[in-house]
Amino acid sequence: MTWLLAGFAAAAVAGCSGGATGASTAASSGQSFVTGSYSTTVFRPGSRLAAPPVTGTTLAGRQLRLRSYRGDLVVLNFWGSWCGPCRQEAPALAALDRRLQSDRVRFIGVDSHDQQAAALAFERTFEVGYPSLSDPGGVVALQFYGTVPPASIPFTLVIDRSGRIAGRVIGIASYSGLKKLISDVQPRTS
């Protein structure tokens, strides 16, 4: 199993360091971040894949299971305190989290390749009120290999109320763009 994860990691790093969105490398982490443009995708209900069984420990030391959010729409954002584009999108994510809580939209962060003190400082600086999983080795991101480039952040996934991957943003998620994506993946009621 270890060699399989190592193989996925090598493929992810080799295949995701450039592309249409561009990438830059943070020297302190060896991790890439997306620069330039972004792309948004909405997956049709019939083609949505089940989200992997993500579990882990939050920066606050609590256990979190993605499965326990079934019935809610989940916005899963992958970030790092060292990532300039992540810092740029953080205020929009925090504001949307506050605005959409009553609509059963839950935000979860996944902090990539960070020291805990730096990650907690990021959350304080940007007033992030939602939980973030600590993912220092990139294991959570690798679970989404094939859906997103796990070696380049930021990226954001929208998980529908049935636990399926309904949409994604690769690159900086803007307030208006992410709000529209969330609206587009929710079931129509009328």
Residues of each region from the PLM?
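Structural microenvironment flanking redox-active thiols in thiol-disulfide oxidoreductases
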Residues: 87-126, 136-143
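Thiol/disulfide oxidoreductase modules built on the thioredoxin-like
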Residues: 121-129, 136-190
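Short, conserved catalytic or interaction motifs in soluble domains
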Residues: 18, 88, 161
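N-terminal targeting signals for export/organelle localization
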Residues: 1-55, 190
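A short beta-strand-turn-helix
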Residues: 45-48, 53-74
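N-terminal post-signal-peptidase region of extra-cytosolic proteins
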Residues: 39-40, 59, 64, 142-144
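Short active-site neighborhood of thiol/selenol oxidoreductases, capturing the structured segment around
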Residues: 64-87, 93, 107
